[in-house]
Regions:
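Beta-rich carbohydrate-recognition and catalytic domains
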Residues: 1-16, 20-79, 88-141, 149-228, ...
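Extended, compositionally biased non-globular segments
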Residues: 307-311
Length: 357
């Protein structure tokens, strides 16, 4: 999928889509549509497949969300609903969308709910309680996605869980790039987190939906390809090996005259324990997808593959095949195939036990 010629809503890019099967079994994408001035809406499109079962195009179906709430608007007339991930939350029997709401305060995680994917109810900004002296609220936060079922919180109680990446001051890739050799890593402030929210025992949405009170640090940068930053990608999906997440990592490329610290966004795989998702069973030592195509190397932001959507291909009798939908250089949407192996590869990187990479 790429910007439609003459469509003012897509002038600056079509990227970073959510992907989810609807009640009708069709696959729907929720791409970020960027208009002039970095004004972002969340669209909706139905995926078309060719005879081989591969995605071959989309049918645009309109807008799912556009900036309307105060937490999505900026004073200059701009605003943003960005980078959605959609999960069917089984305890709520509804679809939940986590997206970045971009206001004058910066990006924050917002939630919306739907039963049919076409009509969405805003739930407001997610809130996060403090953890060991760390204040999450008031901090830029992005790359969020939800587990489809309740999972045990740090106390062992089943709760709704969200994967997210707070962007504490000083932890952006642009701020870290250029530091030579080894550097100190603040494990709490440079990590992907899982945070937990109580849900009503009857499975209905409660008044505290979106209030995440407990937390667990999941992963921090380990390998060279993710040295500058790691962040969430596709929503967790359960496989026979555990919870599969395709996440992103950022490294620094060789300097050029145009950019003293050019960055490279790649994608890797993380598998979490089925019973205890706080435990990483496998993690990519090397990326599984890197910017190599011209559309990934040149665009609004060069050298970016940014995974956000995942689709298990049960529909064609291939449950070990996963189609990954990702942003290409912040301008287009690509698709890649990931085949689940019978056994996890040996030697997957563990999480960092020391504050140095």
């Amino acid at each position: 999928m790429e910007p439609e010629p003459g469509n003012a809503q897509e002038t600056e890019g079509v990227l970073n889509p959510a992907a989810v099967r609807g009640p009708d079994g069709e696959l729907y994408l929720f791409p970020r549509l960027v208009a002039k001035g970095n004004y972002s809406r969340i669209g909706i499109a139905r995926v078309r497949f060719n005879q081989a079962g591969d995605p071959s195009g989309v049918e645009r179906l309109g807008i799912a969300l556009e900036p309307e709430a105060d937490y999505e608007l900026r004073p200059n007339g701009g605003g943003g609903c960005e980078d959605p991930r959609v999960t069917f939350a089984e305890p709520l029997r509804s679809y939940l969308m986590a997206y970045a709401a971009f206001s004058a305060h910066g990006p924050r995680i917002a939630l919306a709910m739907s039963t049919d994917l076409f009509h969405w109810k805003r739930l407001g900004l997610a809130s996060f309680g403090p953890f060991e002296g760390i204040e999450f609220d008031g901090v830029d936060d992005k790359d969020a996605s939800l587990f489809p079922i309740a999972i045990p919180n740090p106390s062992g109680h089943p709760e709704l869980a969200i994967v997210h990446r707070p962007l504490f001051p000083g932890t952006r890739p642009e701020e870290i790039a250029g530091h030579p050799g080894l550097r100190g890593v603040d494990l709490h402030r440079e990590s992907i987190w899982i945070s937990y929210c109580p849900i009503a025992t009857d499975g209905h949405a409660s008044d505290c939906l979106g209030r995440f009170a407990s937390h667990h640090r999941l992963a921090t940068p380990v390998s060279p390809w993710e040295r500058l930053k790691i962040g969430g990608g596709t929503p967790p999906i359960l496989t026979r090996h555990g919870w599969l997440i395709v996440y992103h990592g950022v490294s620094e490329l060789a300097r050029t005259n145009k950019s003293p610290h050019p960055l490279c966004y790649s994608a890797g795989v993380m598998v979490l324990s089925k019973e205890h998702p706080q435990v990483i069973r496998y993690r990519s030592v090397e990326p599984v997808l890197t910017p190599s195509l011209p559309q990934e190397r040149d665009g609004t932001v060069a050298n970016v593959v940014f995974p956000t959507g995942i689709d298990r291909r049960d529909d064609i009798g291939m449950p070990d095949r996963f189609d990954i939908y990702y942003g290409m250089a912040d301008n287009r949407i690509g698709a890649a195939r990931l085949n689940l192996p019978k056994l996890l590869p040996p030697g997957g990187a563990a999480d960092s036990q020391e504050e140095r990479i």
